[in-house]
Swiss-Prot record:
Keywords: 4Fe-4S, ATP-binding, Cytoplasm, Iron, Iron-sulfur, Metal-binding, Nucleotide-binding, Nucleus. This is Cytosolic Fe-S cluster assembly factor NBP35. The gene is NBP35. One of its GO terms (cellular component) is cytosol. [4Fe-4S] cluster 1 binds at C21, C35, C38, C44. The keyword Cytoplasm applies. Heterotetramer of 2 NBP35 and 2 CFD1 chains. Component of the cytosolic iron-sulfur (Fe/S) protein assembly (CIA) machinery. Required for maturation of extramitochondrial Fe-S proteins. The NBP35-CFD1 heterotetramer forms a Fe-S scaffold complex, mediating the de novo assembly of an Fe-S cluster and its transfer to target apoproteins. Required for biogenesis and export of both ribosomal subunits, which may reflect a role in assembly of the Fe/S clusters in RLI1, a protein which performs rRNA processing and ribosome export. CDD domains: Mrp_NBP35 (cd02037). It comes from Candida albicans (strain SC5314 / ATCC MYA-2876). Its cofactor is [4Fe-4S] cluster.
Length: 331
């Protein structure tokens, strides 16, 4: 292996890796925003393999047929991010004229196949690429879960292997001639999956991120980090939704607070940080049941307070997407 192809050993670095470092083994080593002013920048720049990733033009061409690309993020696990992703996909796909795709990038904990009623399905490969599994005529789904020999198999991968799968999903999945919305479910926090998807999709453009939280401060602490990640990665924050905001009794329809907003909840956080607050969604046990059964919650309980709240959030999100397009047109 020639010197120009040698990966940098951490022992060669002049100083510890700073926060938000892309990693000395990354293609962005020495070139990222976090590299500016770093004592290691010259070392990383001189020894990293140069030249653009040959797969990037292929990814860009594949994704150029998709009108809107939305990332669904959460700072902490267990706040209902994947559940809300499934609700978002069902809600947009309710309009039969709109083609929707859902991509499950929560590689170590894929749950969208169960929630969308596609568990046990498999992916078919053709000359045009991988075909997503369609849970409705206008709603396709792609997940690593479809490739596992056993649904209970643990996925124990390091960053490089996760990165390779994400690249393959973006490069090889054939969503058809036209896709109106691609909703991407990501793992909680800021990890390899987030860095990979933002890097590969940067050229073709991401409409923005939807952040899901619950009202209590312990969840909001990590949301602040997620917002910081989006700003440093130049991802527009389309808005924040506060999930499990109150509990709706399925019998009396009364609402009570389960997770109290001790510091003002998501709405106050949005006011402090200047991001759109898209709304609050009450906790309804029937949502969990619908997800377990792989059924559309809106079909079963169209008049429930939770269904109304979710649809209001989806409308507000789509307004933000359109607003972003208008701002781009003005520029």
């Amino acid at each position: 292996m020639s010197p120009s192809q040698t990966q940098i050993e951490k022992s060669q670095l002049a100083a510890p890796e700073p926060e938000h470092c892309p990693g000395p083994e990354s293609e962005l080593a020495g070139q990222g925003d976090a590299c500016k002013g770093c004592a290691n920048q010259e070392i990383c720049s001189s020894q990293t393999v140069k030249g653009p990733d040959p797969d990037l033009p292929i990814i860009t061409e594949r994704l150029s047929a998709i009108d809107h690309k939305i990332l669904v993020l959460s700072g902490k696990g267990g706040v209902g991010k994947s559940t809300f992703t499934s609700m978002l996909a069902w809600a947009i796909a309710a309009d039969e004229e709109i083609e929707v795709g859902a991509m499950d990038l929560d590689i170590c904990g894929p749950s969208l196949p169960r929630m969308l009623g596609a568990e046990g399905e498999s992916v078919h490969q053709s000359n045009s690429g991988w075909s997503p599994v369609y849970v409705a005529d206008n709603l396709g789904l792609m997940s690593i879960s479809f490739m596992l020999p056993d649904p209970d198999s643990a996925i124990i991968w390091r960053g490089a292997k996760k990165n390779g799968l994400i690249k393959q999903f973006l490069k090889d999945v054939n969503w058809g001639e036209k896709l109106d919305y691609l909703v991407v479910d990501t793992p909680p926090g800021t990890s390899d999956e987030h860095l990979s998807v933002t890097t590969y999709m940067k050229e073709v453009g991401i409409d923005g991120a939807l952040i899901v939280t619950t009202p209590q401060e312990v969840a909001l602490l990590d949301v602040r980090k997620e917002i910081d990640f989006c700003r440093k990665a130049n991802i527009k924050i389309l808005g924040l939704v506060e999930n499990m905001s109150g509990f709706v009794c399925p019998n009396c329809k009364g609402e009570s607070q389960i997770f109290k907003a001790t510091t003002g909840g998501g709405k106050r956080l949005c006011e402090e940080l200047g991001i759109p607050f898209l709304g609050s969604v009450p906790l309804d046990p029937r949502i969990g049941k619908a997800c377990d059964m792989g059924e559309c919650f809106f079909d079963s309980y169209p008049d429930s307070p939770a269904a109304t709240a979710i649809l209001d959030v989806v409308d507000a999100l789509r307004d933000q997407v359109e607003l972003s397009l208008e701002n781009l047109a003005i520029k």
